[in-house]
Amino acid sequence: ISIGYLLVKHSQTDQEPMCPVGMNKLWSGYSLLYFEGQEKAHNQDLGLAGSCLARFSTMPFLYCNPGDVCYYASRNDKSYWLSTTAPLPMMPVAEEDIRPYISRCSVCEAPAVAIAVHSQDVSIPHCPAGWRSLWIGYSFLMHTAAGDEGGGQSLVSPGSCLEDFRATPFIECNGARGTCHYYANKYSFWLTTIPEQSFQGTPSADTLKAGLIRTHISRCQVCMKNL
């Protein structure tokens, strides 16, 4: 059944993801998280087709002024992309060395709208009655980077349910230099687990190291209504 709804899948690897069974692939591309220009961020919802650009560039946009003059790759604007599990580079990467670090994506034609459901627990939430599962993941909330700019995901969007958790799920690319790197000023924010009591007043401060982090990250499931 093809009705024209769009579903976006991000592989978080350098391989194009497959569309769910019965869905046609409309195009594939690279997983764009957000742009930064004039020190202001413009976010992309990872659940919408605009987050899957068919072609990759460290600087996929230019800017124009009121004097009818436009400039490309001439200042410190940036682009941010979902990344892969490739080993962290010691230095910024350029040219073809960038490719292994950029997540691939596919835009699929779906028969119904897909939603994300979050458990706020380490258990996988159930889809509503009459809905089926498309994938399970971790509840991705928001992100910040250079200049405290960033963005976030609507928690009903499939883009808020990433199949793979990592503390640094995206990479920064500098348009003028044509390089990409994981810088120390990038932060990711995730829904956390909440005790079974549905109302929590004062949380207890905690610091989580590798190996324990996933025990405090909310799980999610992307669901689609059965037709």
From Swiss-Prot:
Give the disulfide map: 19-108, 52-105, 64-70, 127-223, 161-220, 173-180
After translation, how is this protein modified? Prolines at the third position of the tripeptide repeating unit (G-X-Y) are hydroxylated in some or all of the chains. Type IV collagens contain numerous cysteine residues which are involved in inter- and intramolecular disulfide bonding. 12 of these, located in the NC1 domain, are conserved in all known type IV collagens.
Q: Which GO terms describe its cellular component?
A: basement membrane; collagen trimer; extracellular region
**Main location per the UniProt record:** secreted
Source organism's superkingdom?
Answer: Eukaryota
**One Gene Ontology term of the molecular function aspect:** extracellular matrix structural constituent
Give start and end of each Collagen IV NC1 domain: 4-227
User: Matching InterPro entries, A to Z?
Assistant: Collagen_IV_NC, Collagen_IV_NC_sf, CTDL_fold, NDNF
Give a yes or no for keyword Ribosomal protein in this entry: no
Subunit relationships: There are six type IV collagen isoforms, alpha 1(IV)-alpha 6(IV), each of which can form a triple helix structure with 2 other chains to generate type IV collagen network. Interacts with EFEMP2.
Function in brief = Type IV collagen is the major structural component of glomerular basement membranes (GBM), forming a 'chicken-wire' meshwork together with laminins, proteoglycans and entactin/nidogen. Potently inhibits angiogenesis and tumor growth.
- The identity of this protein, by name, is Collagen alpha-2(IV) chain
Organism, as annotated: Bos taurus
State the taxonomy lineage: Eukaryota, Metazoa, Chordata, Craniata, Vertebrata
